[in-house]
Design a protein with these regions (language model features):
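Substrate/ligand-engaging "lid" and interaction regions
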Residues: 1-225
Length: 225
């Protein structure tokens, strides 16, 4: 993050009388705090970045003001929060709190670049990162991660010629195909039932977005009784 604070685990022992720098923020259960941040807040942000870039937006406020993107980001976040609640007992914020966050992002003064939020997509598509991690946690608790896997699918379309990982991602898909790309970048074990199911959810979303695997019909045919 580019925030001017540093979260520090409260259990870390400093010498007696040590004066903490003003940018230190002490947190209990730092590991759980980081999981919560990455698998919910960062999940939502990268959904805005991947989808917003796909639809030609440059900044997060532009993406948030697209109703479809906003809905997908909200429901992906909600899936992740429900899984975190099941696994760690973390409460799910109410919709009013989410509304405040979305209104902040939608402000014309909040112009964070999507290229910054979505940068290094290969890292963000890895198994334990902000998308695949919570998606697998959802499946562990019998929550279908439909919108998270949709975000992953949009991530497979992510393009930025100034981003080395984005270029590598698209080159790999071009050379090896989307199916191999999903297992490779998301680090999925196809012999594992849960991970195999996740693979197919991602693939189905990708094909639907790309409008592939659709049976063509002749729309000019005239039907008579």
């Amino acid at each position: 993050d580019d925030k001017d604070i540093l979260m520090v685990d409260n259990s870390f022992l400093f010498p007696d009388g040590y004066q903490y720098p003003s940018f230190f923020v002490l947190k209990d259960n730092m590991e759980i705090n980081m999981i919560e941040k990455i698998w919910s807040e960062n999940l939502r942000h990268v959904t805005f970045a991947f989808m917003g870039t796909y639809y030609g937006y440059q900044t997060i406020n532009q993406a948030v003001n697209n109703l479809y993107i906003r809905k997908c980001a909200y429901y992906a976040w909600k899936e992740g929060r429900l899984a975190l609640n099941e696994e760690y007992g973390l409460p799910v914020p109410d919709d009013e709190a989410v509304k405040v966050e979305f209104e902040k992002f939608a402000s014309p003064f909040f112009r964070d670049q999507l290229s910054r939020i979505g940068r290094e997509p290969i890292r963000k598509l890895k198994k334990n990162d902000r998308l695949v991690g919570p998606a697998l946690l959802c499946m562990k608790h019998r929550i279908i991660p439909y919108f998270i896997t949709r975000s992953i699918a949009y991530g497979m379309f992510y393009q930025d010629q100034n981003d080395k990982e984005a270029v590598e991602l698209q080159n790999y898909i071009s050379d090896h195909g989307i199916e191999r790309a999903i297992t490779h970048f998301c680090e999925l074990d196809m012999d594992d039932v849960m991970e195999n199911s996740l693979f197919h959810l991602i693939l189905c979303n990708y094909n639907e977005i790309a409008k592939t695997n659709i049976i063509p019909i002749n729309e000019n045919v005239t039907y008579t009784n």
